[in-house]
């Protein structure tokens, strides 16, 4: 895998169940949600565990307590080093080894790589097993190609310890306008003559923030996260018994801040995660149902566990 560098980065309050939102863009499934054509599963309860799984892309964001469904994913992206986001890492690797699956590839912020290596050293000593995996430090602005049609880039987030989010891009090669309509045989000849007949189109599909203050929305380097098809963003607090200022003290985001910056969010769908455990499911649902335009109808909640 090639890492590219670009010039262009918990103190968690401990709370997600299946969303009742049902429309053509976000349907509640028996397991997880289907949003904008992507199946999204997992659990995210602030201070307890966060793991968001995209099965069709064979990847997961953060590993929490290592829910069983996450074990099937080949690629794992860790946003930061707080226990509710990284605690299940050794179990994830060990379980894949138990099932004789391909050793996983794990991406972590550069600042925590050495600590993660020490975690595995300790578990190898205790468990007397290899815990095979590939560990890659991915810094803000760096990107990794997972396959020919898929790449991931790290972007800066704003938490109380080093943190970062990730953007998943689709890569497509589209025939240039001047060659559209040509016979297949002529297209074949052009290709064999090394003529560049396609344009590469890179599209941000999914952005995952992990834990962060709303400052990431105002960071001009994060524009792709704000125009990704789906933005998976923390919203630890959703009502006014805890203020936005309180949320910032813990390095988190309040739903009111997402409303405040709604005009900057070009995403087709927004999936809220990482709700405080203080909330009952109906409180979360009521907060989302009360959202004003332009958020109404395109915001969903990962509420497994509430």
What is the predicted role of each segment?
Residues 2-74, 165-168, 174, 198-209, ...:
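Conserved beta-strand hairpin/beta-sheet module of binuclear metal-dependent hydrolase folds
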Residues 45, 49-53, 74-82, 203-208, ...:
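Acidic/glycine-enriched edge-of-secondary-structure segments
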Residues 45, 147-226, 230-235, 240:
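Active-site-proximal loop/helix segment associated with metal-binding centers of metalloenzymes
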Residues 61-64, 73-84, 109, 207-212, ...:
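Active-site neighborhood of phospho(di)ester-bond hydrolases with catalytic His/Asp-centered motifs
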Residues 62-108, 137:
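Active-site metal-binding motif and surrounding structural segment of the metallo-beta-lactamase
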Residues 88-95, 121, 280-289:
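Metal-dependent catalytic neighborhoods of phosphoester/phosphodiester hydrolases
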Residues 102-104, 112-137, 278:
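Active-site neighborhood of divalent metal-dependent phosphoester bond hydrolases
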Residues 130, 134-142, 216-306:
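Binuclear metal-ion centers of metallo-dependent hydrolases, dominated by the metallo-beta-lactamase
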């Amino acid at each position: 895998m090639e890492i590219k560098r670009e010039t262009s980065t918990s103190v968690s309050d401990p709370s997600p169940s299946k969303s009742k939102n049902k429309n053509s863009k976000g349907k509640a499934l028996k397991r997880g949600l289907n949003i904008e054509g992507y199946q999204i599963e997992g659990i995210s309860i602030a201070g307890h565990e966060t793991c968001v799984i995209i099965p069709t892309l064979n990847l997961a964001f953060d590993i929490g307590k290592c829910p069983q469904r996450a074990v099937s994913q080949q690629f794992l992206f860790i946003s930061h080093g707080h226990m509710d986001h990284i605690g299940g890492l050794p179990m994830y690797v060990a379980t894949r080894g138990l099932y004789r699956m391909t050793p996983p590839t794990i991406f972590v912020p550069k600042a925590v790589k050495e600590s993660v290596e020490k975690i595995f050293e300790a578990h190898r000593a205790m468990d007397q097993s290899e815990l095979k995996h590939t560990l890659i430090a991915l810094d803000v602005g760096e990107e990794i190609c997972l396959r020919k049609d898929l790449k991931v880039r790290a972007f800066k987030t704003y938490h109380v310890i080093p943190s970062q989010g990730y953007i998943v891009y689709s890569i497509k090669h589209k025939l240039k306008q001047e060659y559209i309509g040509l016979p297949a045989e002529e297209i074949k000849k052009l290709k064999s003559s090394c003529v560049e007949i396609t344009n590469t189109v890179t599209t941000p599909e999914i952005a995952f923030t992990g834990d962060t203050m709303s400052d990431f929305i105002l960071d001009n380097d994060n524009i792709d996260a704000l125009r990704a098809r789906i933005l998976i963003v923390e919203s630890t607090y959703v009502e006014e018994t805890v203020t936005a200022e309180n949320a910032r003290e813990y390095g988190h985001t309040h739903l009111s801040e997402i409303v405040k910056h709604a005009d900057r969010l070009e995403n087709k769908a927004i999936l809220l995660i990482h709700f405080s455990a203080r909330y009952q499911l109906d409180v979360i649902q009521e907060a989302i149902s009360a959202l004003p335009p332009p958020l109404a109808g395109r915001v969903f909640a990962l509420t497994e566990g509430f």
